[in-house]
Amino acid sequence: MKLFKLVNFTKSYDLIWLVITPFVPLLIFYRIIIGKEEILRIKERFGYPSTTRNKKDKLIWLHAASLGEVASATSLAIGFKKANYKGLILITSGTKTSSEFTKNYKDIIHQYHPLDKKKWVNRFISFWEPDILIVMESDIWPNLIFCSKNFGLPVVMASAQISNKSFTRMKNLGFSSTANLFNKVDLILATDKTQSEKFLQLGAKKVLTAKSLKISLPPQKTDQLYIENLRKGISNKIIILAASTREGEESILINSIQKLNKKNHNVFLIIAPRHIQRANKISKINNLNIKIKSKDGLPSSYDNFWISNTYGEMSNLYSLADIVFVGGSLYPFGGHNPSEPCHYKTKIIMGPHSEKCQDIVREMKNSNALIQLNSNSEDEIINSIEKIIINKDFSKSLSIAGSKLAKSWLKIKTNIAYKILKKFPLLVS
């Protein structure tokens, strides 16, 4: 019965791909137009390589969805190197921002992941000949898993987690269907005990509790000359960075900063939106005509707001900021990871929504390294910022607590790498 359901599912999935394949070029063309695909690398989406591979070396394949998951994958890649893995590391992902992120790490090969049609996935695996597939978090594509197993690859899920919404949806598929899928995974390293329990309820058997790899990524290098020039333009204002903001959040934050400045707090807001193509729309909020980096350059002392819309900027901005507001948290977007700014000894605030990073948020709050708001009200945002500005001892304690946590997190990636290498010794033979 289980085998029948699995065969039935794969046949249905293959049939879906048969129907939609003629429309894939239109989808790719549309994504090129809206700036979400690199035209010179389109062939990667169909499993063709855009670079070479030394077949003499072992190759670990880390698959991630977008920027957040690629940060986890990069963290694990560094962990493998620290654990004395000598082979190649390939990261696949689906977004331009994630591809750009990997350029900071010379030992990593990046390719856009093939779309999940069996023919294209098989073509990809046939060329790259990976020794293992490690899926980051929960970016599970059926043919990615099935084809990898057909090629005899071990499959691991690292930093594994499932949102409540996805968990409910998967439970509705039925236990036997999800069990058949997850039992093709040789090892699941969940981010916490709650996540481990979710995978067990879906029929997975080989589950261990580890931690999130996102929090173990070391800070990237900063451009001190650029930071100094940016600071000179802003002058002596208190700098707040709104990091990875989502639609609707910028208006609330801009209103809050305007009210703070009416109270003579002399605050400057840098907005770094999660999706940089929204920069023009953000610049028009409250008819402010906010300067955008890509068009207008750096801010001056006459500005109170500035939009950073270029890639590879966050480490510089975290280093510059006195206070960081973590976006995706004022409305139910799940919240973005608040751990990264801890490495830069800044003060961190986020909104009430943290469904996607509850464990990290809980740890940071328990260590007094994070202010989490109870609502998205402007008054609460203003009060939190004022507390940091006025209470110097409180402000200092926030920074110190975050910095201590960041140092402890750096060990996680190597510990997880050792677990995987111990489980699959062929990777080091």
Indicate residue ranges for each PLM-predicted region.
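Nucleotide-activated sugar donor-binding and catalytic core shared by glycosyltransferases
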Residues: 1-429
